[in-house]
């Protein structure tokens, strides 16, 4: 499904833990890392697509996460010309994305990148909140910067809650200092 401007509707997913770290996933068979993302199918809402992609790419369901925020607007990036498939119609020149910030509610042991017959990722790790902005492929950096800026106040308040002795998510134990 490509819109009239040549952009494919898509969802992006930022999963954070109680410490404010985010899940950073390695693309299958590559040394390329990114947040989970995927297309919105015809007749599907952005939220429905997010839950489908969450299960397909990360192996988590609704009960495993809590939606903390979503972007107010669509965010767009253009594909580099070398990645555009000019021989397909309609031509997709990029993606327009709605992003969701999720908090992990289950044990990280539940994360399973191999639930799909065609896995998108073959590994993951927790990274500091701003790390992805500097590390993602260059044509996605502006969108990542905008997403992380929009979600930052939510994640920072989460970190403050933990620092002040807030309850940890199920499956997590606070480290004692």
Curated annotation (Swiss-Prot):
Keywords: Hydrolase, Metal-binding. Residues 6-149 form the Nudix hydrolase domain. Its cofactor is a divalent metal cation. It is an enzyme of class 3 (hydrolase). One of its GO terms (biological process) is mRNA catabolic process. Its EC number is 3.6.1.-. A motif (Nudix box) lies at residues 38-59. It comes from the Bacteria. PROSITE patterns: NUDIX, NUDIX_BOX. SUPFAM superfamilies: Nudix. The keyword S-adenosyl-L-methionine does not apply. One of its GO terms (molecular function) is metal ion binding. GO terms for cellular component: cytoplasm. Accelerates the degradation of transcripts by removing pyrophosphate from the 5'-end of triphosphorylated RNA, leading to a more labile monophosphorylated state that can stimulate subsequent ribonuclease cleavage. Belongs to the Nudix hydrolase family. RppH subfamily. This is RNA pyrophosphohydrolase. It comes from Edwardsiella ictaluri (strain 93-146).
